[in-house]
Amino acid sequence: MTPFWQLAADSDAVAVIDEQNIALTYRELAQSVAALAETLPARALVFCLCDNSPGALVGYLACLNARAVPLMLDKTIAPELLQQLLDIYRPGFIWQQGAEGYALEDLQQPAPEMDDSLALLIATSGSTGSPKLVRQSYQNLLANTRSIIDYLDIDRHERALAWLPMNYVYGLSIINTHLAQGATLLLTNSGPVQPGFWRFVKQHAATSLSGVPYSWEILKKLRFTRMDLPSLKTLTQAGGKLRPELHSEMAAWAADKGLRFFVMYGASEATSRMGYLPPELAADHPGVMGRAIPGGRFALEDETGAEITAAGERGELVYYGENVTLGYATCRADLAKGDERHGRLATGDMASRNEAGLYTIVGRKTRFLKVFGNRVGLDELEHLVVNAFPSTECVAVGRDDNVQVFITDAHQAEAVKSYLAKTCQLHHSAFRVTGIEAIPKNPAGKTLYRQLEALCD
């Protein structure tokens, strides 16, 4: 398989259409990438301040072709957070948008020592300027791209809507897989609540739509299932667990319309993807994550590290595969480190496996509290509240014997508290329910739990 970053320089197929309706062929994109790659020294460290635009895409691909190492960052990153990263990692170059488009700025810094296999740096999921980065190798990128193409059956006829952030592994995986197959990317920075988003989808006949759980909640409120989108063939969901009720609703609707609905599972530490639920199983298995992607393997381990083989037992989900990344970096010197994981990733997620070999995520290993001696899953509490009070959003955090629940409908605080105490059979003093205007989320739609934890008593 030719690496996706090595574009077909003789192809006049359309590679990219942006939200100004400007199209670039593979030939044109390859020329722009080659021109920039010639100016980049091999093994240079490059900060790519990106959005979903052809300019940002050129920077990303040029780095990979030149064997420079890009760190993908949101172009709207707060200046103080960017400065923190600049101080820690001291990159040689920044690729960023200026008054006349994207341009390369030489920072006159010597290149750090970097492992030969290091291809890409990306911030950990939910990170907001944290210096903790995931180190991804060329082999990681190739292996995960190949697996995703395999189970999604991506071909050159696809026209993928690329609206998830390019600095987020889910968004980046859409770009990688479709470029690898010579398909078309529809790049946009708008979202579902903006009218231009749906005009763009319809005008350019998008064949696939992807989103995180929060995206699908918004789509439900927008009555997405009533929209006329005749070109749409594939729906994908990753970035967290979808509510089983919404999973069931979307899967049933997709099956009725002849669409494919994929529930998927992944992490930055696994390049992007680890698991998926085949569309033909989606309607009958609400809340189920699925099976390992082609070339990967799952196992469950108990607290001692012993493998759990019995169906229905809970344990930590462990993934094995070529897409397991090299490890983390928290400082410049870490870029010289080699493979610290050796193809094994303890995900930190608790899961169970049924008799058919399908896995269900039940919560984060760190998202369980002891409340008056009882083990309480915070993810399960959130699910209970949202189902019983559908008009509110909910996030649960806290510490042992003190569960802090934040809801967006403050008028229901006492009702939620009483409901949780009764349903969980715990004294009401275990719960503190607070109204909040909006749940803080990052650009990828993931909840920023640390911001809420900082508000706790």
Over which residues does each language-model region extend?
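Gly/Ser/Thr-rich phosphate-binding loop
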Residues: A206-G211, K220-H285, R297
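Conserved ATP/PPi-binding loop(s) of AMP-dependent carboxylate-activating enzymes
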Residues: R291-G295, A306-G338, V376
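Conserved pre-ATP/AMP-binding loop-to-beta segment of ANL
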Residues: S11-D12, D106-A123, S130, R135, ...
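Conserved AMP-binding/adenylate-forming core of the ANL superfamily
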Residues: D12-P41, Q83, Q136-Q139
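Conserved AMP-binding A3 loop
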Residues: A23-Y26, A119-R146
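Conserved AMP-binding/adenylation subdomain of ANL enzymes
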Residues: L142-R159, V169-S208, I293
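Conserved AMP-binding/adenylate-forming
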Residues: I22, L36-T76, W163, R375
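AMP-binding/adenylate-forming catalytic core of the ANL superfamily
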Residues: C48, G321, L326-G327, G343, ...
